[in-house]
Amino acid sequence: MYLNQKLRGSLTKRCGERRNVMNDRMIKVNILGEQKEYPYGTTYEKIVQEYQSKYEYPIILLMKDCKLCELHKKLKKEGTIEFITTQDQIGYETYRRSVSLLLLKALHYVGGYDNIRKVTMHYSVSSGYYYTIDGDIVLDEKFLSKVKAYMLELVERHVPILKRSVGTEEAMELFHNHKMYDKEKLFYFRRVSRVNIYSLEEYEDYFYGFMASHTGYLKHFDLYLYDDGLVLQLPKRESPNEVPPFAPRPKIFQVQKESAQWSETIQADTVGDLNERITKEGANNLILIAEALQEAKISQIAEQIVQAGNRKFIMIAGPSSSGKTTFSHRLSIQLAAHGMKPHPIGVDNYFVNREDTPLDSNGNYNFECLEAIDVKQFNEDMSALLRGEEVELPRFNFKTGLREYKGDFLKLGEEDVLVIEGIHCLNDKLSSSLPSESKFKIYISALTQLNIDEHNRIPTTDGRLIRRIVRDARTRGASAKATIGMWNSVRRGEEENIFPYQESADVMFNSALIYELAVLKLYAEPLLFSITKEEPEYAEAKRLLKFLDYFLGVPSESIPSNSILREFVGNGCFDV
């Protein structure tokens, strides 16, 4: 049935009048405790321009009533606005993601779209990202200088970064046409009906998270040739307007490269690849292969220790949730298989009494600084053991906050070694009285081998945070909200106390398992869903939930009882 022409004209007129009324009305918002009014449809970018002078660093996103918004969006409802700068974690990641888009556009423009088959973002190097290029180009200083010059030109022009929503099928077709086969495979397993595509002029791509509204925000970066590719060097979060000097760490880079090469060998270097293997073969075989690889690596480390000769102190350090405790147990078993007598010691047992623990800037106990350890007593005990004396070792009572002695005596024989685990173990200030030739240093971290796709990496800190959320809930009854809330403090402690010493290690061990996020997903999702949108941790919880949604879930029944992953999901054979 069709409306007659007169009625249709009347309805059109009334709808137009209603739109005009909407467009003419003022919208009230609360900003920094002030009530402000703006015309309906004002862009958030225009509002930001009014307040930018109050902030030291660029405002790159905002929060409207607990919901993240990009600055090209328009104001349509009343509410509260909070600004997010490039020094805030979410804003900082938005900046890094946006510069990555800028680089990809420049590489294809300078190199020629027909000449570049694939650009892959791999892992973090120095303060940036390591990329490789597969194509008919010569990657040298001349090419890199042209790319950088074009990036700076785009920054100067303030080119809009546009966003459009398309159906998943259309997105997959677009990815296929652009030869982004990793993305095409990834979205085959996605349950969402629509996908956000970002474009910078003619270059189109998908990114895991929000972007800057235009290239004018992206002033701070540098490019360096490194290994077989290039590094996009970016600011650190604490100083987002400064690009630090390029300072690669060759040992950790080599471990990351070896892990990535292994993932490529088994054809599972992206989340789409992993999901495909799970659907076609099941996860059991992949679990067994990954666990066998780790066991072989641990055995190799044990052999290196034996061959090094007379190393009485095996010093193990690594960031939070790297699996240090399970690793030390498995290494001890391998050492025993080589005829040695390992004795595990936790540096935590040498904490000073609670009342003597230093405080951080917020007045909370700082258990992560070196001063929280009784370094003098630790050195006296270790030196005495090295001299062949019998020593009574302490146990720290975490309930009373006191160090206790309960007759735990130890004397080292010829085959005895101490397997010492603690965040400061690579710092020679902890063991200054021990000869360097008596120590064998091991750095352990969960260096995720997988990428989401060729242009979206998985930060190693995300894998460790998800491990920590699952373990804290199981062992301490801690909420995901509490774990997320203290994570930045943990990260600051790692930056100060662990990462500066990692290159001093004799050997490095990657504890990440290629299948682990598919398992952790089933444990972490219910915990993350418990965080409500009114809580400050909601944005991070929502980001992690979106991230985990890329993975197909895998039950934990097939995981061996001695797996490092058991330290987090439970039912392991070690007392950790």
Stretches found by the model and what they are:
Residues 337-355:
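Short beta-strand-centered segment that lines the nucleotide-binding/catalytic pocket of NTP-utilizing
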Residues 32-42:
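Short, contiguous acidic and Ser/Thr-rich linear segments
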Residues 327, 331:
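Hydrophobic positions on the alpha1 helix immediately C-terminal to the Walker A/P-loop
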Residues 73-76, 80-94, 106, 110, ...:
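Auxiliary tRNA-acceptor-end handling modules of aminoacyl-tRNA synthetases
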Residues 356-399:
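Conserved nucleotide-sensing/catalytic segment adjacent to the nucleotide-binding pocket
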Residues 314-316:
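Hydrophobic anchor at the beta1->P-loop junction of P-loop NTPases
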Residues 309, 431-576:
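Conserved NTP phosphate-binding and transfer environment spanning the P-loop NTPase/kinase superfamily
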Residues 324:
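Conserved lysine of the Walker
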